[in-house]
Amino acid sequence: MEKRVARRGALRQKNVHEVKNHKFLARFFKQPTFCSHCKDFIWGFGKQGFQCQVCSLVVHKRCHEFVCFICPGADKGPDSDATNLHKFKLHSYGSPTFCDHCGSLLYGLLHQGLKCDSCDMNVHKRCEKNVPLLCGTDHTERRGRILIKGAVKGSKVLVEILEAKNLCPMDPNGLADPYVKVKLIPYDAHKLKLKTKTIKASLNPVWNESFTVDIGPEDNSKRLSLEVWDWDRTSRNDFMGSLSFGISELIKSPVEGWFKLLNQEEGEFYGVPVTDDITESIQEIKSKMHRSSISSEKRYPEPDKVQNMSKQDIVRASDFNFLTVLGKGSFGKVVLAERKGTDELYAIKILKKDVIIQDDDVECTMIEKRVLALPDKPPFLVQLHSCFQTMDRLYFVMEYVNGGDLMYRIQQEGKFKEPVAAFYAAEIAIGLFYLHTQGIVYRDLKLDNVMLDAEGHIKIADFGMCKENIMGDKTTRTFCGTPDYIAPEIVLYQPYGRSVDWWAYGVLLYEMLAGQPPFDGEDEEELFTSITDHNVSYPKALSREAVSLCKGLLTKTPAKRLGCGPNGERDIKDRAFFRPIQWERIELREVQPPYKPRIKSRKDVSNFDREFTSEAPNVTPTDKLFIMNLDQCEFSGFSYVNPEFVVTV
């Protein structure tokens, strides 16, 4: 073929911006589009944003340099690990919804897109192959980031506010006038207000200012709050983002680096570090989880038969001064007691043998003792000091948990903010995970049985309803539990396993978030009908992450219920509701609780119901004739002293 000279137009290579193997090009969007990094709308005319030519990720021009994951088109790191796969399923949306990857509308009437069962991510079917495998992690920065240093030295908190990047535009010119407020929360009006200078017309302000906040011992349960605000000359200043750190956490370890700015509710309880390379972060988390699983195997060995006490360790009722009734019920009563000759305080649960025999509860009592005596328990289960018996009674000597229970707190506050509920739910979950690994179904999880210690950490109490040896597919059929928390399979007399605990966990979580039970009825029959047949309605104030978690836990079919699958623990920890939760630190009690109970003195019982504490700790008489004819062998092996018990004075 003869070659000829022809006219051709000139070429110019487009300006490609490479970030973490993404190849971003400026682009004009013909339809409304949202940024996948900050979740804000992409405004303007012309080429308003950037789109990756490999994976189609869409971001603002100002956001592209902060994308923290490797482009899936070039992905060879931990983002490719199957353990971080999204669980996408076809979904029909009832209201306009935008793709969390490319930012454009999920169009159509039915099955418009895919929704992840675990993290609630919404994407187009065409985008699924390009989505990074980061299920359970949050790679977005909705309000920008701030660089700070914080430490406690003596009685002073030292804070350095250095700079911020990629803040939200707040003014008509697309910029903002940011400044930072520094304070302790809960806020004391008598303390000095501290704030930085205002940087005019900037989304990337540099302050480089230092502050000192005086603290006393009473401030250790408070949090250092940093809030970024936009200054306005004519109207109220606008909130831009915040974060906070527990003073007790800063005392243990200073903080330094970039942190995400959060909304007001989250910022009151969290300080989330920015991970510029989320790939490395995931690798580090996985190695920690691997080490944690190895250590947990050592920490939680198979339960063995407990050793009975030696003669020199014998504990008697005469060793204690009984002070105040803390609670009572059909089982007997719980009394605050002081060990004679010491400052040691204990909560002693006293049960009548005649009532136990008549109610056929001997085995339940022995199970409760064996569960309390399990070795190497996590710190979120009540500790047992010892068990002993007299001719007519059984005594459980346990640690005194003096912060009251969650029922008392809910009655005081009405309901909890979501970060508070997430903290309590995470600590409760650690306790349930342990019990389930031991083959124990708890069966009586409720607000009344979740106590708060002096620091504000939770303690699960009352193991009288537990069922042992429920491993794998093994089930039981006993009808038991507290009516409001009973799972549908118990109501329907179906065989069940640990699934009933996750149902009760869902009910408890709903009560913490909504301040009311999810099911109700005039009587038990109506209540049980509601549990088996009715759907739960959720307050509009709840976030979609909270609703998604509650729906997963309150699924009526046990096999489909969250937490009941082969990877139940991972499924719960990976939920979007728990994204800010650092599980490893939660397990080690390193996270400062959101609330510290008010305790006036060692023997203070003001956090317990006055109906009980006003009662004298008298021992009520038993049926002497019945006791004389009682076979005491029924309770052989009950007496026990815990060699692992740690005395706290």
Curated annotation (Swiss-Prot):
<dbReference type="InterPro" id="IPR014375">
    <property type="entry name" value="Protein_kinase_C_a/b/g"/>
</dbReference>
<dbReference type="GO" id="GO:0005737">
    <property type="term" value="C:cytoplasm"/>
</dbReference>
<feature type="binding site">
    <location>
        <position position="238"/>
    </location>
    <ligand>
        <name>Ca(2+) 3</name>
    </ligand>
</feature>
<feature type="binding site">
    <location>
        <position position="232"/>
    </location>
    <ligand>
        <name>Ca(2+) 1</name>
    </ligand>
</feature>
<feature type="binding site">
    <location>
        <position position="232"/>
    </location>
    <ligand>
        <name>Ca(2+) 3</name>
    </ligand>
</feature>
<dbReference type="InterPro" id="IPR046349">
    <property type="entry name" value="C1-like_sf"/>
</dbReference>
<dbReference type="GO" id="GO:0004697">
    <property type="term" value="F:diacylglycerol-dependent serine/threonine kinase activity"/>
</dbReference>
<keyword id="KW-0723">Serine/threonine-protein kinase</keyword>
<keyword id="KW-0677">Repeat</keyword>
<dbReference type="GO" id="GO:0005524">
    <property type="term" value="F:ATP binding"/>
</dbReference>
<dbReference type="InterPro" id="IPR000961">
    <property type="entry name" value="AGC-kinase_C"/>
</dbReference>
<feature type="binding site">
    <location>
        <position position="349"/>
    </location>
    <ligand>
        <name>ATP</name>
    </ligand>
</feature>
<dbReference type="InterPro" id="IPR017441">
    <property type="entry name" value="Protein_kinase_ATP_BS"/>
</dbReference>
<comment type="similarity">
    <text>Belongs to the protein kinase superfamily. AGC Ser/Thr protein kinase family. PKC subfamily.</text>
</comment>
<feature type="binding site">
    <location>
        <position position="238"/>
    </location>
    <ligand>
        <name>Ca(2+) 2</name>
    </ligand>
</feature>
<keyword id="KW-0862">Zinc</keyword>
<dbReference type="GO" id="GO:0008270">
    <property type="term" value="F:zinc ion binding"/>
</dbReference>
<dbReference type="Pfam" id="PF00130">
    <property type="entry name" value="C1_1"/>
</dbReference>
<dbReference type="InterPro" id="IPR008271">
    <property type="entry name" value="Ser/Thr_kinase_AS"/>
</dbReference>
<dbReference type="InterPro" id="IPR000719">
    <property type="entry name" value="Prot_kinase_dom"/>
</dbReference>
<dbReference type="InterPro" id="IPR002219">
    <property type="entry name" value="PE/DAG-bd"/>
</dbReference>
<keyword id="KW-0963">Cytoplasm</keyword>
<comment type="function">
    <text>PKC is activated by diacylglycerol which in turn phosphorylates a range of cellular proteins. PKC also serves as the receptor for phorbol esters, a class of tumor promoters.</text>
</comment>
<comment type="function">
    <text>This is calcium-dependent, phospholipid-dependent, serine- and threonine-specific enzyme. Activation of PKC by serotonin results in presynaptic facilitation of depressed sensory-to-motor neuron synapses, which is thought to underlie behavioral dishabituation.</text>
</comment>
<feature type="binding site">
    <location>
        <position position="235"/>
    </location>
    <ligand>
        <name>Ca(2+) 3</name>
    </ligand>
</feature>
<feature type="domain" description="Protein kinase">
    <location>
        <begin position="320"/>
        <end position="578"/>
    </location>
</feature>
<keyword id="KW-0863">Zinc-finger</keyword>
<feature type="domain" description="C2">
    <location>
        <begin position="138"/>
        <end position="259"/>
    </location>
</feature>
<feature type="binding site">
    <location>
        <position position="230"/>
    </location>
    <ligand>
        <name>Ca(2+) 2</name>
    </ligand>
</feature>
<protein>
    <recommendedName>
        <fullName>Calcium-dependent protein kinase C</fullName>
        <ecNumber>2.7.11.13</ecNumber>
    </recommendedName>
</protein>
<feature type="domain" description="AGC-kinase C-terminal">
    <location>
        <begin position="579"/>
        <end position="649"/>
    </location>
</feature>
<dbReference type="InterPro" id="IPR000008">
    <property type="entry name" value="C2_dom"/>
</dbReference>
<dbReference type="InterPro" id="IPR035892">
    <property type="entry name" value="C2_domain_sf"/>
</dbReference>
<dbReference type="Pfam" id="PF00433">
    <property type="entry name" value="Pkinase_C"/>
</dbReference>
<dbReference type="Pfam" id="PF00069">
    <property type="entry name" value="Pkinase"/>
</dbReference>
<keyword id="KW-0479">Metal-binding</keyword>
<feature type="binding site">
    <location>
        <begin position="326"/>
        <end position="334"/>
    </location>
    <ligand>
        <name>ATP</name>
    </ligand>
</feature>
<keyword id="KW-0547">Nucleotide-binding</keyword>
<feature type="active site" description="Proton acceptor">
    <location>
        <position position="444"/>
    </location>
</feature>
<dbReference type="InterPro" id="IPR011009">
    <property type="entry name" value="Kinase-like_dom_sf"/>
</dbReference>
<dbReference type="GO" id="GO:0106310">
    <property type="term" value="F:protein serine kinase activity"/>
</dbReference>
<dbReference type="InterPro" id="IPR017892">
    <property type="entry name" value="Pkinase_C"/>
</dbReference>
